[in-house]
A protein has these predicted regions:
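Compositionally biased terminal segments of proteins
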Residues: 1-120
Length: 120
């Protein structure tokens, strides 16, 4: 997914801006640090989760080992308390804190992470 694809999907979702933020690779694409991401990962508030869980049929069996709900091949979400959101307020959408992404990538240290580490 390139930046246009990500922004189009976010627009279609039409989630309230203050109830979610864009995670990891997709946030790097929006920032212009990376050209593409495999999918869009979002952290959403418990309040937003309660509003959308029936629409997207979000049941525990749709969670992966990292507690992300798989909605489709392009979108996964994880739920957190708004008070614990680790984000940077940005336009047009809030993004995961860059230092958090960098720390995660340094710890995981896959080949694709090494490329991102140099660019961040």
């Amino acid at each position: 997914m390139n930046k246009k694809d990500i922004l189009n999907l976010l627009s279609k979702l039409n989630f309230p801006k203050d109830e979610f933020y864009v995670l990891s690779g997709a946030s790097l694409v929006i920032r212009g640090i990376r050209d593409e991401a495999q999918d869009l990962d979002l952290c959403i508030s418990k309040e937003l989760f309660n509003q959308i869980k029936d629409t997207y049929n979000l049941t525990d069996d749709k969670k992966n080992e990292c507690n992300f709900y798989h909605i489709n091949d392009s979108l996964e979400i994880v739920v957190d308390n708004k008070a614990q959101f680790n984000m940077e307020v940005a336009e047009p959408y809030n993004l995961e804190d860059l230092h958090t992404i960098l720390d995660f990538k340094k710890k995981r240290n896959k080949p694709k992470d090494q490329v991102d580490i140099l660019k961040i």
